[in-house]
């Protein structure tokens, strides 16, 4: 029983890495570099991200032929490289795992590439949910 105690102590003191659940206003601050890029406003981004990942940096959605990763749900078929997709185009030249961390710098760089190639319609939530009536997506700090 004594040999189990140190393991238990380590488990308590160093919990597993958990998803960073951001708030709307915290995320608004993190997305300053993206605001206005390709004429997409910050409230539009906050709305899109809420609907696709719930502001969860470690969100992964499994589809029939690919997975989508992180806040922006970037797919491993075209934009990032994962161990589960055999032939990713990896346009963003990034591991999908990097899209699950709390550093959004590389995520935003990839998002800009996606916008340049596919436009905002890459995010299916935009048109039906986030293209107008965006009052609720403004943060008081904006």
Swiss-Prot record:
Binding site residues for Ca(2+): 98, 101, 103, 106-107
Subcellular location per the Swiss-Prot or TrEMBL entry: Secreted
GO CC, alphabetical: extracellular region; protein-containing complex
Signal peptide: 1-19
Residues passing through the membrane, by range: none
Gene Ontology MF: a single term: calcium ion binding
Record keyword Transcription present: no
Record keywords: Calcium, Disulfide bond, Lactose biosynthesis, Metal-binding, Milk protein, Secreted, Signal
Subunit record text: Lactose synthase (LS) is a heterodimer of a catalytic component, beta1,4-galactosyltransferase (beta4Gal-T1) and a regulatory component, alpha-lactalbumin (LA).
Family according to the record: Belongs to the glycosyl hydrolase 22 family.
Protein name (record): Alpha-lactalbumin
Originating organism: Cavia porcellus
